A protein has these predicted regions:
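Glycine-rich FAD pyrophosphate-binding loop
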Residues: 17-37
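FAD-binding beta-loop-beta segment adjacent to the flavin cofactor pocket
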Residues: 273-277
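Beta1/beta-strand and adjacent pyrophosphate-binding region of the FAD-binding site
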Residues: 1-8
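Conserved Rossmann-like nucleotide-cofactor binding loop
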Residues: 8, 31, 158
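Active-site-adjacent segment of FAD-dependent monooxygenases/related oxidoreductases
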Residues: 37-112, 116
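Glycine-centered short loops/turns at secondary-structure junctions
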Residues: 9, 20-22, 117
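Conserved FAD-binding catalytic core of PHBH/FMO-like flavoproteins
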Residues: 107-265
Length: 277
């Protein structure tokens, strides 16, 4: 049994099912929602996508950066590598470095898990877990019981499984960092230089005082994902909230004019970065 149908839960389900195990996934959401932003998939992970025989949609929805550039926050180029896609494939036996939207990857993993006859139980919240008996028993808030030889806790930072295992509340620990994130459609981008970066996939990193930023293409050059990492300033008890254009302008004061172009749009969200204890 796997608790959680996020990326880690689905990946575990595929690996176990492909090895011949009978797998059930327990998920509290009523359905897989289209949430999240961009992900950067390194060659060790993209190699697994092939091993798992993920559907062609996972590759069609990806963007493979042809160049990697590191900028000083004022715009000066500190490092640049052309033919980044070819160099990575040559170095890692054909496995690519790709950028993609979390939703696209989750849907591809889910489709493959269904092909492998993984059973999914949605709208089920874990109430308690009994590991003393065999097989282990998981009881949901609705009173339904699920049994298995192994329970994998893949239910995220706010894991109910972890609380059941350690016998107490176990909140995630703050890292002191905050990530501002936004995904832009290419049609929203007016700056010609920035639009060229999106349509011809590249990855750009800006390093500044107390902060750094990353921008890269998604969906074959149709979208741009932007992340800005800064010190955490969210109110106590708040893990996510919308960011304002005014906040972005203050954070980007004196930064590369090209990056300022992509920061001055509505729709930013601040994410509190944490880790499990």
């Amino acid at each position: 049994m796997i608790v959680g149908a996020g990326l880690s839960g689905l990946a575990t389900a595929i690996s176990c099912a492909a090895s011949g195990h009978s797998v059930q996934v327990i998920e509290q959401a009523k359905e897989l929602a289209e949430v999240g932003a961009g992900l950067q998939i390194t060659p060790n992970a993209s190699r697994l996508f092939r091993h798992w025989n993920l559907p062609a949609s996972v590759w069609a929805s990806a963007a493979e950066p042809t160049a990697m550039t590191v900028h000083r926050y004022t715009g000066e180029v500190l490092a640049h590598e052309s033919n980044y896609d070819k160099n990575i494939r040559a170095k890692y036996a054909g496995a690519p470095f790709i950028d993609m939207h979390r939703v696209d990857l989750q849907q591809a993993l889910y489709a493959r898990a269904r092909e492998l006859d993984v059973a999914f139980h949605f709208d089920e919240r874990v109430e308690r877990i009994d590991c003393a008996c065999h097989p282990a028993t998981l009881t949901t808030r609705a009173g339904r019981e699920y049994r298995g030889d192994l329970i994998v806790a893949a239910d995220g930072l706010w894991s109910r499984c972890r609380e059941c295992f350690v016998g107490r509340k176990d909140d995630p620990l703050p890292t002191g960092d905050l990530a501002y994130r936004i995904v832009l459609d290419a049609a929203q981008i007016e700056d010609p230089e920035l639009r060229a970066w999106v349509e011809h996939p590249e990855c750009h990193i800006w390093i500044g005082p107390g902060a750094h930023a990353v921008a890269y293409s998604l969906r074959g050059g149709k979208m741009l994902n932007i992340v800005l990492l800064v010190p955490d300033n969210l109110p106590p008890g708040v893990s996510r909230q919308p960011g304002s254009v005014e906040e972005m302008r203050a954070l980007f004061a004196g930064w590369d004019p090209v990056y300022v172009q992509c920061s001055a749009v509505p729709g930013w969200t601040g994410w509190w970065l944490t880790m499990a204890g």
